[in-house]
Amino acid sequence: MLLQGALLLLLALPSHGEDNMEDPPLPKGACAGWMAGIPGHPGHNGTPGRDGRDGTPGEKGEKGDPGLVGPKGDTGETGITGIEGPRGFPGTPGRKGEPGESAYVYRSAFSVGLERQVTVPNVPIRFTKIFYNQQNHYDGTTGKFLCNIPGLYYFSYHITVYLKDVKVSLYKNDKALLFTHDQFQDKNVDQASGSVLLYLEKGDQVWLQVYEGENHNGVYADNVNDSTFTGFLLYHNIVE
């Protein structure tokens, strides 16, 4: 340490030579005998440099997780109607409905026959053999059907013809509407028949009778041959 201090002192003294003489060069190299000074403190940080240029694109990263579901979009325009699909399977049966109101059934019918040969022409034929007359709309004492229910009726008759020709008419309220003529063939039993649809009002009467006298009164009946008269209501015309 004493030697180092002496050297520093000698260096600080002025030279006794000429003023223009250069100072002798300092020794070079680590082997010159000089010792390094104490390291100084670190300097202040410099100002940040400018942004560098963009680097080259990196490799494609891995697929990310799905994002959150976005809000519902606006309703789109109606599309074109598609083709008709196949027929579906039958549905399950529905519940049983409640009972409906009962409908009243209007009935009017009769079917009658002769018990013996007709002897009197030009009057209603009295059919007294009753097959059906539950409503009693046919009167066996007069031979006439009396309409109690307005509506459409069907009437028919089948006459056994024997011994004479037959001319029979169906009457409605004293007016002949239907005519049947059958000529008797000797020793043979024949049949004559007719049928008609009639609309009747309440109070109308319908019957059969022989017309044009005794020579056309071959209406016949016995225990094996019948002559019949039938009528019944097809549908009523009652406003409820």
Swiss-Prot record:
It is found in: Secreted. The modification 4-hydroxyproline is found at P39, P42, P48, P86. The record marks N225 as: Not glycosylated. HMW complexes are more extensively glycosylated than smaller oligomers. Hydroxylation and glycosylation of the lysine residues within the collagen-like domain of adiponectin seem to be critically involved in regulating the formation and/or secretion of HMW complexes and consequently contribute to the insulin-sensitizing activity of adiponectin in hepatocytes. Polymerization and secretion of adiponectin is inhibited by succination of cysteine residues by the Krebs cycle intermediate fumarate, which leads to S-(2-succinyl)cysteine residues. GO terms for cellular component: cell periphery; cell surface; collagen trimer; endoplasmic reticulum; extracellular space; perinuclear region of cytoplasm. Keywords: Collagen, Disulfide bond, Glycoprotein, Hormone, Hydroxylation, Repeat, Secreted, Signal. The keyword Glycoprotein applies. GO terms for molecular function: hormone activity; identical protein binding; sialic acid binding; signaling receptor binding. Residues 1-17 form the signal peptide. Residues 50-65 have a biased composition (Basic and acidic residues). Important adipokine involved in the control of fat metabolism and insulin sensitivity, with direct anti-diabetic, anti-atherogenic and anti-inflammatory activities. Stimulates AMPK phosphorylation and activation in the liver and the skeletal muscle, enhancing glucose utilization and fatty-acid combustion. Antagonizes TNF-alpha by negatively regulating its expression in various tissues such as liver and macrophages, and also by counteracting its effects. Inhibits endothelial NF-kappa-B signaling through a cAMP-dependent pathway. HMW-complex blood contents are higher in females than in males, are increased in males by castration and decreased again upon subsequent testosterone treatment, which blocks HMW-complex secretion. This is Adiponectin. The gene is ADIPOQ.
